[in-house]
From Swiss-Prot:
The gene is gpaF. Residues 320-325 are annotated as: G5 motif. Gene3D superfamilies: GI Alpha 1, domain 2-like, P-loop containing nucleotide triphosphate hydrolases. GTP binds at residues 38-45, 172-178, 197-201, 266-269, 322. PROSITE patterns: G_ALPHA. The keyword Ubl conjugation does not apply. This is Guanine nucleotide-binding protein alpha-6 subunit. SUPFAM superfamilies: P-loop containing nucleoside triphosphate hydrolases (SSF52540), Transducin (alpha subunit), insertion domain (SSF47895). Residues 30-347 form the G-alpha domain. Belongs to the G-alpha family. Signal peptide: none annotated. Residues 170-178 are annotated as: G2 motif. GO terms for molecular function: G protein-coupled receptor binding; G-protein beta/gamma-subunit complex binding; GTP binding; GTPase activity; metal ion binding.
Length: 347
């Protein structure tokens, strides 16, 4: 009987130790940090905003949505100004009745102007100008617009209404440069994560070093549709080349030896449309495959994954559409398992 008693005691101790280990793992998982990185305009901040929707079942408050209004108005003004300047540079004439209007519109200072009904009406009038429309068709080849420009141009009638309140989709597409470090605590299936979004422009990257401690995973976002675009900071540098170079640096960094590397090849929807207008061979002269999404996307995926030095390092790649909540929700469910599994292995 004494033997059985001792055995039961050992079993009890063993169970307590096991429980303690599980509790420690839960505690460790409770501070899981995920770093969201990528070059400027890759769409990573849009993915960050998606977390708000996923975390609260899409329940952005009316007040929170209204806060995006000014950003959207600024987006509209600046992008129409880009079109007006591009039309003049290319040599496309606007309709005679809109020439003076376009000059006045260029005088608007987006950083200080207050949106009015008149500005809204003038924005609609300019967007409907045949010369502006012709200029718009030459985007990417002659000049660059924000990814969300077409979306807001096509929704100008709604956006310029007096009682306008941005929709969640409007908020997702509102373009604002991330400066500094933004954090969000999110929970997926009882797993707590701290998502850290850091500005992707070159001037912001020096701040990344402060985020490298105890990172369980790095989500790197690269824009698929940017293969024919130049950096805003340096027009002599191709965006995809810059993104690839940056990913190589991150993938092989000593800081992330024990971190999961998750690659989001983003803007899949825009990439599919871009291929119809701009063949991939215009960027990669050595590419000899078909100009289809399947062929080119696989080529790009292999190109990114080939930069790792350690052959045993796993890169988890996903094709994403940052403005599609269902797509991001599905992807996050997949990567949650990757992150949790990776962290559990380390404990």
């Amino acid at each position: 009987m004494a033997f059985l008693c001792k055995s039961n005691d050992n079993t009890k101790v063993s169970m307590e130790i096991e429980k303690s280990i599980k509790d420690d793992k839960r505690t460790f998982l409770g501070i899981t940090q995920v770093l969201l990185l990528g070059a400027g305009e890759s769409g990573k901040s849009t993915i960050f905003k998606q977390l708000k929707i996923l975390q609260e079942n899409g329940l952005w408050t009316t007040k929170e949505l209204q806060e995006f209004s000014n950003t959207i108005y600024i987006n509209i003004i600046t992008q129409l100004q880009v079109l007006i300047n591009a039309a003049e540079s290319i040599g496309i004439q606007l309709q005679p009745e809109n020439i003076q209007l376009s000059k006045d519109y260029l005088e608007l200072n987006h950083s200080s102007v207050t949106w009015t009904k008149e500005i809204g009406e003038n924005s609609v009038r300019l967007w409907n100008d045949s010369g502006i429309k012709s200029t718009f068709e030459k985007r990417d080849k002659e000049f660059q617009l924000n990814d969300s420009a077409e979306y807001f141009f096509n929704n100008l009638q709604r956006v310029t209404q007096d009682n306008y309140i941005p929709t969640p989709q409007d908020a997702l597409r509102a373009r604002v440069t991330t400066k500094g470090i933004i954090e969000a605590d999110v929970t997926f299936d009882n797993i707590n994560m701290k998502i850290i979004d850091v500005g992707g422009q070159r001037s912001q990257r020096r701040k990344w070093i402060h985020c490298f401690d105890k990172v369980s995973a790095v989500i790197y976002v690269a824009g698929l549709s940017e293969y024919d675009q130049a950096l805003r900071e340096d027009i002599n540098v191709n965006k995809m080349d810059e993104s690839l170079s940056l990913f190589k640096e991150i993938c092989n960094s000593k800081w992330f030896d024990s971190s999961s590397i998750i690659l989001f090849l983003n803007k899949k929807d825009m990439f599919i449309e871009k291929l119809k207008r701009v063949p991939f061979k215009t960027y990669d002269k050595k590419y000899t495959g078909e100009n289809s999404f399947e062929a080119v996307s696989l080529h790009i995926q292999r190109k990114f994954e080939s930069v790792k030095i350690d052959p045993n390092k796993k890169i988890y790649t996903h094709f994403t559409i940052a403005v599609d909540t269902e797509n991001i929700e599905f992807v996050f469910k997949v990567i949650k398992k990757i992150i949790v599994g990776h962290v559990m292995d380390l404990v």
